[in-house]
Design a protein with these regions (language model features):
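Conserved acidic segment of CheY-like receiver
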Residues: 2-13, 17-18
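A generic structural motif
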Residues: 25-30
Length: 131
């Protein structure tokens, strides 16, 4: 089972992703949900996850900085950005982080399905190559 965290400062987004999306279909366990990047990184400093689903603009630490720090600690972590911002500086930041996807709010679950399927494929491929 893959382990994932969700990080978004909007309670409705956190609730929607946790309660209404079918993570179990992809054998993904959401182990924690956070409202800001700094608190999420405190968790990541001690706990490995396979997938980071994060907003970009948040208090205390933005999603790009969170992703950079997470990638420094776990180079194989997969990242999906979810944001209401269409500014190219955020898109470039996501590209630099080699994110699996950048999904605009409000989240279309078909788009999220495609991104999550890519994550599962990438992790399975990595695990097969290690064997």
């Amino acid at each position: 089972m893959l382990r994932a965290i969700i990080v978004d400062d909007e309670q409705m987004v956190r609730h929607g992703l946790l309660s209404y999306y079918h993570w179990d279909k992809y054998n993904i366990e959401i182990v924690r949900v956070f409202a800001d990047g700094a608190t999420a990184f405190e968790y990541l400093a001690q706990n490995h996850v396979d997938l980071l689903v994060t907003d970009i603009v948040m208090p205390r630490m933005n999603g790009i900085e969170l992703a950079q720090k997470a990638r420094e600690k776990y180079e194989d972590i997969k990242i999906i950005f979810i944001s209401g911002y269409t500014d190219t500086k955020y898109l470039w930041g996501a590209l630099k982080m080699n994110a699996v996807d950048y999904i605009f709010k409000s989240v279309d679950f078909d788009e999220l399905d495609a991104a999550v399927e890519r994550v599962v494929y990438m992790v399975e491929k990595r695990n097969t190559e290690r064997e």
